[in-house]
UniProtKB/Swiss-Prot annotation:
Topology versus the membrane: Lipid-anchor
Name this polypeptide is given: Uncharacterized lipoprotein TC_0107
UniProt keyword Signal present: yes
Keywords from the UniProt entry: Cell membrane, Lipoprotein, Membrane, Palmitate, Signal
Keyword Membrane tagged: yes
PROSITE patterns according to UniProt: PROKAR_LIPOPROTEIN (PS51257)
Signal peptide limits: 1-21
Residue numbers with lipid attached (N-palmitoyl cysteine): C22
Intracellular or extracellular location(s): Cell membrane
Gene Ontology cellular-component annotations: plasma membrane
Length: 218
């Protein structure tokens, strides 16, 4: 009887061990994967889309490094002023007369319409030596009359003086007002050399214009 029990008990154990080797365990173990399946899963993992956070940061980095550097503003080009010994040409005198008469006579609308012509004329007389320009004004009664009319039009005069002062200060920074040139200019117009020198050294351009307008040579 004992032999019979041992025999069947041993057979049952063999049967259970055989079943456990071919069936999943109660803990959910899965059959072993072959090499091809492992490679396929690793490829899928690598191709998995980035999470929202990673996607956002990588996008920000791309934008940061692709951002263009701000363009540097070009430095203003200073005029290459002519020498005081260089006389004005007839064309330059014509351009000066046009600018003064337009600013003195034209209405606001007419000035706006003639803006291109005025700018063109100004660009052509831009490099005339400041003292030569003032001397040309003082020697022409029509230009003196035009300058006085401009003084009566505040907004025109303010714009004119702002641009003129800027150009004259640029000339001063380049050393265009030599002692000899200032003395020759004052002598030509019958002005006191010391007074003119003081005005030029102080860059009081509005005062210099006023002296020229009020003390014409003819």
């Amino acid at each position: 009887m004992k032999k019979f029990v041992y025999k069947y008990s041993f057979g049952a154990l063999l049967l259970l061990s055989g079943l456990s080797s071919c069936c999943p365990s109660s803990y959910g173990s899965t059959p072993a994967k072959n090499t091809a399946e492992i490679k396929e899963e690793s490829v899928i993992l690598r191709e998995e889309p980035e999470s929202g956070c990673k996607k956002k940061s990588s996008c920000c980095l791309r934008k940061f490094f692709s951002r263009k550097k701000p363009k540097e503003k070009p430095e203003p080009v200073l005029p290459n002023f002519k020498s005081y010994a260089d006389p004005m040409t007839d064309a330059e005198r014509k351009d000066l007369s046009f600018v003064v008469s337009a600013a003195a006579e034209k209405s606001s609308i007419a000035l706006a319409m003639a803006q291109g012509e005025i700018k063109g004329a100004l660009s052509r007389i831009r490099e005339i030596h400041p003292l030569v320009l003032l001397q040309a004004l003082a020697e022409d009664p029509a230009l003196i009359a035009g300058m006085k009319k401009m003084q009566g039009r505040d907004w025109v005069w303010n714009i004119f003086m702002t641009e003129l002062s800027k150009a004259f200060s640029q000339a001063a920074s380049l050393g265009a007002f030599s002692v000899a040139d200032v003395a020759a200019f004052a002598s030509t117009l019958g002005l006191d050399s010391g007074t003119v020198t003081s005005i030029v050294d102080g860059e009081r351009w509005a005062e210099l214009i006023d002296v020229v307008i009020q003390s014409p040579t003819i």
